[in-house]
């Protein structure tokens, strides 16, 4: 076994986790600040991310016209939804904060649950490291976090938790979808723009799906699915 194929040591894994944590913290600051201050800062951040995602997608699909068209929809629709949601002066800020909280909690809880419990794989052909334990753990914790927003804002913890569960499921589906696309093209990461995370597509795949889920819920079930929508 040569050095290139040797499994990562504990020290290397810890170093990688530290790099991921630092990168995540650095990205979270401007993201949360832009949500708080709203347009034009949030709009600019979303557009910048969309441009980076477009560049990554075009590299990934190697200029294939059908995949380029698919990428146009995959990137532009969720980006437009995020800008539209935050543009609501009355409820935009809390809606995006809630979405971020649910998606990020799902990601973290799924990772911790999957690593600590293990068990059957969720989709071994698409993402070999993901487990059913991680999937269920992510949904469970995200549901609790989503419902907890009722403490600070008007609304039922039960309904907020329910919509949080839906968004958590959608976010993990979005993660798997992007993994499937990468596997189709035989790549591990969409780029190396974000140290420890890969590319922007790798970092926002769950958020993209979560935003679409909120839009679908809002217009299929009515504006009162959440107290602020």
For the regions a language model picked out, list residue spans one by one:
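Interfacial loop-to-helix junctions that mark the boundaries of transmembrane helices
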Residues: 38-40, 132, 229
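Juxtamembrane boundary at the C-terminal end of a transmembrane helix
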Residues: 216-229
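Core hydrophobic alpha-helical membrane-spanning segments
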Residues: 48-50, 212-217
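Transmembrane helix interruption/hinge and helix-loop junction motifs
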Residues: 34-42, 154-156
